[in-house]
Amino acid sequence: MEMGRRIHLELRNRTPSDVKELVLDNCRSIEGKIEGLTDEFEELEFLSTINVGLTSVANLPKLNKLKKLELSDNRISGGLEVLAEKCPNLTHLNLSGNKIKDLSTIEPLKKLENLKSLDLFNCEVTNLNDYRENVFKLLPQLTYLDGYDRDDKEAPDSDAEGYVEGLDDDEEDEDEEEYDEDAQVVEDEEDEEEEEEGEEEDVSGEEEEDEEGYNDGEVDDEEDEEDVGEEERGQKRKREPXDXGEDDD
């Protein structure tokens, strides 16, 4: 899927100014450039374009509020001065798996005064002698390089991804609200179904009672007939001796 198309889908009926987080991983860039992204995304704080075939960030729009930029697994080899111009408030930058070979390529990042974390995993520059020491000298504002500070202490997850988690929490709250609404609808439907079932049970119960009553009536009638028959037979037996006596006379 092309990047422009992917951005359109990610908007999901929102306006660009409503978007704080945009993930475009694994889509396809045209001619290795960013497309479809404009300065209308003025509230954007997190942008991820992992493995999209980028060779340049020249088309990156002005994103003053962008804090974290994921550019890993692309083919970027230079032109990073654009980042200082277009994303002046970057705090986290991931360039892992790109074609960065020497320190001069990352030197323009000195202008990113708020840059706190830089990742260059799987870039050729990491093979240079005294790589870490030289990068920290070149970019004194850095706290973490490839996930570790100057003393080789690992960056805590909360520091690296805290504000992104905050964005996720907001989205989860929205999802929970939607879920609650859906759940209420389902509950209402279930209540209606239960009421209908209850009414059906009442009707069937009445029918059963009527049938039982009808059957009981038949049994009572039969018993009454039997009683009448026995009485008649008794009367006959009583009359027979009397009749015999009259004959004797």
Swiss-Prot record:
Q: Where along the chain is composition biased (Basic and acidic residues)? A: 147-156
GO CC, any one term: nucleus
Residues the record lists as Phosphoserine modifications: S17, S158, S204
Family, according to the entry, reads as follows:
Belongs to the ANP32 family.
Q: Which UniProt keywords apply?
A: Cytoplasm, Endoplasmic reticulum, Leucine-rich repeat, Nucleus, Phosphoprotein, Repeat, Repressor, Transcription, Transcription regulation
Q: Phosphothreonine-modified residues are where?
A: T15
**GO molecular function of the protein, one example?**
histone binding
The record's LRR repeats, renumbered to this chain, cover: 18-41, 43-64, 65-87, 89-110
Protein name (record): Acidic leucine-rich nuclear phosphoprotein 32 family member A
* GO biological process, alphabetically ordered: nucleocytoplasmic transport; regulation of apoptotic process
Q: What is the annotated localization of this protein? A: Nucleus; Cytoplasm; Endoplasmic reticulum
Q: Does the keyword Transferase apply?
A: no
Gene3D superfamilies per the UniProt record, alphabetical: Ribonuclease Inhibitor
| Keyword Transcription regulation appears in the UniProt entry | yes
Recorded source organism is Canis lupus familiaris (Dog)
